[in-house]
Amino acid sequence: MSHHSSPPPKHKGEHKGHGLPRGSERGSSSRDKDRSATTVSSSAPMPAGGKSSRTNCPPPAPPKTVNRLINEKSPYLLQHAYNPVDWYPWGQEAFDKAKKENKPIFLSVGYSTCHWCHMMEEESFQNEEIGRLLNENFICVMVDREERPDVDKVYMTFVQATSSGGGWPMNVWLTPGLQPFVGGTYFPPEDGLTRVGFRTVLMRICDQWKLNKNTLLENSQRVTTALLARSEISVGDRQIPASAATMNSRCFQQLDEGYDEEYGGFAEAPKFPTPVILNFLFSYWLSHRLTQDGSRAQQMALHTLKMMANGGIQDHVGQGFHRYSTDRQWHIPHFEKMLYDQAQLSVVYTQAFQISGDEFYADVAKGILQYVTRTLSHRSGGFYSAEDADSPPERGMKPQEGAYYVWTVKEVQQLLPEPVVGASEPLTSGQLLMKHYGLSEVGNINSSQDPNGELHGQNVLMVRYSLELTAARYGLEVEAVRALLNTGLEKLFQARKHRPKAHLDNKMLAAWNGLMVSGFAVTGAALGMEKLVAQATSGAKFLKRHMFDVSSGRLKRTCYAGTGGTVEQSNPPCWGFLEDYAFVVRGLLDLYEASQESSWLEWALRLQDTQDKLFWDPRGGGYFCSEAELGADLPLRLKDDQDGAEPSANSVSAHNLLRLHSFTGHKDWMDKCVCLLTAFSERMRRVPVALPEMVRTLSAQQQTLKQIVICGDPQAKDTKALLQCVHSIYVPNKVLILADGDPSSFLSRQLPFLSSLRRVEDRATVYIFENQACSMPITDPCELRKLLHQ
């Protein structure tokens, strides 16, 4: 199989897909190469249309007016503030106007680093005539999906249920009562041979609204009712969750069926990193180590991670991972970089190192965090959301996807002309790097995936040979080749700094910041790197200082980077959603285990209490995605039921509840965990691969967690040695507790038995509690390591 591939195909809306194998429930968000560029879904018939090219679009007129989005904080909304469209932000003003004027609402949802959102704005929303059509016939509302995931999820559910898939930009037409009746993703501006254009869609919807309004309203109500029934998740008459062993086995088998033996990963291109799947495979391996399936699960996960890290989906020059690969080989990515990918991948590469002992994986994890520190970090400790895929090749030019990341042979030769001393043939540093990373004179990007010729002659770096093979090819020592390549990459990095940069979305989201706190805490603890744990602590302090309302105990969803390093808030604040609480609580629990600072555990307990009050469904079990009051206008109140690019907040919450029960002994949290798993058991039974994170938690709940208690002085060397021993080993189903002997401490008040534990011979001592049994006291790190490996 050739390693030649191509840049992201120029079609379809942007997708943050799940990369799940075929057969996963509601997993059709990933971009499908064979789909047309326009998806239209409707509760009433829509006429077919034709094809269009972006080159047919008339150039946009210079901006004449500023719309009301200029008063927003969201980078995505601000990108549309100079459109001729009379945009409203999501809110009562727009809803009241739609009802008063009896007009349908045109809702457009996207995010600031979305390539196809940029395309639609450039082609349609900047177009004066299209702007006039929108303003005269609709109330136009723009939503940043990252600010309002509840709005996005409700209407994406409609689009996915009534069409072949979903993506962004998502464009939906609503009744004045906010019920959807037509929806789609990216629309080209004009009709072509096979696709309907946006202008035509607008005119036909106008006609339908005038001529068949009652039919549209009836159909919309019927579809909404059907979606409500379909999305119902409830305990029902089930008493206990499904069998973990059965769910585990079925989930593994479904993953095994979709596994790519040669390149790793699951399903067909485009390929997504899917950390939730890799987490599941590692957990499955641990509980099935002595079986063939267990070995297979480990091999699948490690091979996938190695192929991803060697592929072009990793930025070999500046570190960090791009959103997904457009090809089977992980070569040509969609170049956007998302914070949530960096957070989850840093953890899963750290786990790969814990399991394999291969420093390769640790280096990748450290590289990811280096990228986040350098590019996605606010100086006050918070983390930005994303970097765009598009940037101008040169200043003053139109942005192109991937321009910041690709290289020509000529550029590399000019930057790295030095001869390599000791090579078996004449060789420059540039030639060595190009050989190792697969660069060619004509470029290594296939023209079939670059239809506009924007990346002709360009190259995406991808490791083509092992260090050993490259060294043998030129008669060099492996370490010499490693040093030469690292020096070369650093020179490329310094040169790349002078290119026009991609747009940085400096919005900070509580949920993704929580994931990133986990990333720094878990990696720092496992690798014994205190500076990474310190960065996790800074992130948690940022969350508490800027994204937590002390008076109400609630999290805020967003804040924004202001001028001069300041932090700005929206007014009124955007309050947190379920995922904000779930991911922040997980981050705080991981940070407590990494730092042993009990204040983070205390805050996690308070946030969990607030989460339970705001989102728990006392009748059906599980958590709703949004507060009842915040989502009161929406036609659906949903429960997140799929682990995708990010884990489901219900999956994460189930594991949080399990850990909190072990940290505190509070039975009500175990009861909630069991109730949640029972509510989702039918989803897991039907398609376990759609909820691998929840299946993993189900196993942990039925096997029980280990309580690893270390009695000792937190600052003493022997205590630190035992802590580091625990951190260095892959033990996912555990809680780590430091008992310092103070009966008045927070943890001793939660778990009174901690006060009765004693150090042996005044040395730091470990006790392991599992299945209501306690191990013999352990003081030797080697003995502890042996026991944890059993």
UniProtKB/Swiss-Prot annotation:
Residues 23-36 have a biased composition (Basic and acidic residues). Signal peptide: none annotated. GO terms for cellular component: extracellular region. InterPro entries: 6-hairpin_glycosidase_sf, 6hp_glycosidase-like_sf, Ssp411, Ssp411-like_TRX, Thioredoxin-like_sf. Residues 1-67 are annotated as: Disordered. The keyword Secreted applies. The modification Phosphoserine is found at residues 5, 653. The keyword Hydrolase does not apply. It is found in: Secreted. Keywords: Developmental protein, Differentiation, Phosphoprotein, Secreted, Spermatogenesis. One of its GO terms (biological process) is cell differentiation. Gene3D superfamilies: 1.50.10.10, Glutaredoxin. Residues 1-19 have a biased composition (Basic residues). SUPFAM superfamilies: Six-hairpin glycosidases, Thioredoxin-like. PANTHER family: SPERMATOGENESIS-ASSOCIATED PROTEIN 20. May play a role in fertility regulation. This is Spermatogenesis-associated protein 20. The gene is Spata20.
